[in-house]
A protein has these predicted regions:
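Substrate-binding/active-site clefts of carbohydrate-active enzymes
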Residues: 2, 9-133, 155, 161, ...
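Short, solvent-exposed turn/loop segments enriched in Gly/Ser/Thr/Pro and often Arg
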Residues: 2-14, 54-63, 142-148, 171-176, ...
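Hydrophobic faces of well-ordered beta-strands that scaffold small-molecule active sites
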Residues: 4-6, 50-52, 139, 168-170, ...
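Conserved, mostly hydrophobic/aromatic
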Residues: 6, 23, 43, 53, ...
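The substrate-binding groove and active-site-proximal loops of carbohydrate-active enzymes
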Residues: 18-33, 105-121, 137-146, 194-208, ...
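Active-site-proximal helices and loops of the catalytic beta/alpha 8
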Residues: 40-44, 58, 70, 132, ...
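Substrate-binding cleft of secreted/luminal carbohydrate-active enzymes
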Residues: 267-288
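Carbohydrate-binding surface patches
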Residues: 333-347
Length: 347
């Protein structure tokens, strides 16, 4: 099925909304709760699904529980909701060391104690609420490897009981085998796919022989049904745009047509490989950028940098034309030292 995956939609303090204030309401900058219900309904009417981003490893330092800790110190009923508290807890100025554990050393994102039963119960209700009241179809789960495993087992149980066909996709950057044993997640974001494609298509730093070796190793890492469900990607909100990486190849010497060719070949690989392809917004309109403020820029509806919509339409049509692209086996046919790599998808 086709699915929209949305970055955090909840009320937050920062523009990226990975520091959540309120897990029960849509951020007013995006619209209202009813607007979101309407979006979900329209998505479903088109035969599509929609999943949302769950950030349960950390919160905003203005999240109600942390705010209570700041105000009431050791008397706060929420003092066990967070890691590494040293009283008195305050919100430090830029450059000051926080008196609590943070995510990625970001003082505005205190780390939640997901092994705490109260914390667990709170977020189990959040899970249930969006699946039940808004009819979303699943969750993409942020920084999943830093969250307590029993938390995820409970989360899966609640999600599947609430909506049996809900999908749980975890953000795991490395080997995900221990997370894909059937007790936590259905899939993980396959950043290894991006790394291999980056080195071959964009940078040209490996030849077809090494690409074959790394690509096949990636496919053999998990049982085939799990490989089929891996979320393959070239771009996301956490990495520089793939098209920008293609432009870094010194062999092209600023040749835009060569850059476009590298990008198109990588997208061809993405849409025809084993796994579930994920296309990041803006790739179809040529969005570029190395820095966060650029690769997360607004969609250039009126002035596309490079209009690739026909490319994506063609590749998506190709993928849908034959079930072998979804369920079929993967077989390498040929490769050579000049960069040729040929594979087949077959029933």
């Amino acid at each position: 099925f086709n699915c929209l995956y949305l970055n955090p939609i909840f009320t937050a303090a920062e523009y990226h909304r990975y520091d959540l204030l309120d897990y029960y309401h849509v951020c007013p900058n995006l619209g209202t709760d009813d607007d979101f219900r309407e979006l979900v309904s329209e998505v479903h009417n088109r035969g599509m699904h929609i999943i949302i981003d769950g950030v349960f490893n950390h919160s905003s330092w203005y999240f109600f529980a942390f705010d209570d800790v700041v105000k009431n110190g050791e008397n706060s009923r929420y003092k066990d909701w967070f890691y590494g508290l040293k009283f008195p807890v305050k919100r430090p100025e830029d450059g000051e060391s926080p008196s609590y554990t943070c995510f990625a050393y970001e003082r505005k994102m205190p780390k939640l104690n997901t092994s705490n039963p109260e914390v667990r119960d709170y977020f189990m209700d959040v899970c249930r609420y969006w699946l039940e009241d808004f009819d979303v179809d699943g969750w993409r789960l942020d920084v999943a490897n830093e969250v307590d495993k029993d938390f995820w087992r409970a989360f899966r149980s609640v999600a599947k009981k609430t909506k049996k066909d809900s999908v749980l996709i975890a953000e795991i950057w490395e080997n995900s085998e221990r997370w894909l044993q059937g007790d936590m997640f259905d899939s993980t974001m396959n950043y290894e796919f991006r790394k291999v494609c980056r080195d071959f298509f964009a940078f040209g730093k490996i030849n077809a022989r090494e690409f074959n070796s790394r690509f096949v190793d990636m496919l053999l890492r998990y049982p085939f049904p799990i490989v089929q469900g891996q979320l393959n990607l070239l771009d996301s909100h956490d990495v520089s745009r793939f098209r920008s990486l293609c432009a870094q190849n010194s062999a092209d010497s600023g040749d835009s047509s060569a850059v476009d060719k590298r990008f198109r070949l990588a997208e061809l690989c993405l849409l025809t490989s084993v796994g579930t392809p994920s296309v990041f917004y803006g790739d179809e309109l040529g969005v570029v950028g190395f820095e966060e403020c650029d690769y997360r820029a607004a969609m250039p509806w009126a002035n596309p940098v490079k209009d690739n919509r026909d490319l994506f339409r063609e590749l998506i049509k190709l993928r849908k034309s034959n079930d072998c692209f979804i369920h079929g086996n993967f077989r390498v046919l040929d490769y050579d030292e000049r960069g040729k790599f040929v594979f087949a998808r077959e029933d």
